Curated annotation (Swiss-Prot):
GO terms for biological process: L-phenylalanine catabolic process; tyrosine catabolic process. Its cofactor is Fe cation. GO terms for cellular component: cytoplasm. Residues 92-111 are annotated as: Disordered. This is Homogentisate 1,2-dioxygenase. GO terms for molecular function: homogentisate 1,2-dioxygenase activity; iron ion binding. Homogentisate binds at residues 356, 377. Pathway: Amino-acid degradation; L-phenylalanine degradation; acetoacetate and fumarate from L-phenylalanine: step 4/6. It catalyses: homogentisate + O2 = 4-maleylacetoacetate + H(+). The active site is at 298 (proton acceptor).
Amino acid sequence: MTLDLSKPATAGYLSGFGNEFATEALPGALPHGRNSPQRAPYGLYAEQLSGTAFTAPRGHNRRAWLYRIRPAAVHRPFEPFTGRQRLVAEFGDSADVPPTPPNQLRWDPLPMPVEPTDFVEGLVTMAGNGSAAAMNGCAIHLYAANRSMQDRFFYSADGELLIVPQQGRLFIATEFGRLDVEPAEIAVIPRGVRFAVALPDGDARGYICENFGALLRLPDLGPIGSNGLANPRDFLTPQAAYEDREGAFELIAKLNGRLWRADIGHSPFDVVAWHGNYAPYKYDLRLFNTIGSISYDHPDPSIFLVLQSQSDSPGVDAIDFVIFPPRWLAAEDTFRPPWFHRNVASEFMGLVHGAYDAKAEGFVPGGASLHNCMSGHGPDADTFEKASAIDTTRPHKVDATMAFMFETRTLIRPTRYALDTAQLQADYFECWQRIEKHFNPEQR
């Protein structure tokens, strides 16, 4: 049996966010009534994968028990990976992380590679904060690839990977089973989970937020009530699937921002059954239940929050993943696009498809922008003039779009690559320079 990544998956998914799942690819492969029997069914090995401390409170504790053909320890020693490496995991001052300018920054899309490039080889770090070694903060990567991973497997020990495809589907094989992900969906691969990515459409491009800190969770809804935003039932986790395949394979590990490789003589996708609440999942952003004003004003963008990584300060998240999906705008006598803003938090934005309603041009699918702490930002001149004159007695639908934001409590520091790349738009600031002075003290 193999996890055939050459065609779409046929198995279904398990529904729910953070559930205690139990799934087996062979009948009776899950031990009954215990986690680690003296002899596991089918001659399997029992292995626990811990995503939090053993003593974390029950509501935050994440772990899974895997029943596999060989333990994860079975591989040759790691050695430095000699292929292309453009990753950063420490965001203090260094050759990779120069002083952070207060300028608003915007980039064109990462070009598609000319040479054959898989998902791992196509990764590049654009920005981040904190430290993978200290397990706080995040790294923001882009990827551009044009070939599937071949006899190669990958995992990150640095953090969980929130993957946002922008172009091209991803067929992702993991130790837990299969995820098929397309643009307008996201996938989350937990820290330490081994996976491989196939590209059924050839070229693929997208964004990744690698979360070094507390695991992503659904936000509390407060006065919204018991339903709304991203509903738990719409998060999908793989059913158990396995392959018993031997050969000359390569296992790549990411640790403290560096890539390492080891020879491995079998596929690590040999988990026949598993149970627990620490597992990969995907979510369709088009299912987000958008909340907005039906009277006046544009509410704070926290109403668009999909997932959060909490910090030690109540009400202040380390990372927020926010989307700006299709939605109706109905507020009267209101400037409907996102307003002009300076923020104590820092904002890295991307665009999956369509146009963002605060920028008439320049911010294109696959591109990105960074507005750091207290850097002024907001609609460009054309957007402001149009929105200031529109008839707000009639509702308007923002359609055929999907923008998103990684917002963090601490400064997002662009890497040397991000500041030196030809994709950096040197004229981004010009979009605000044509904003006119309308002030007249004689006319209210």
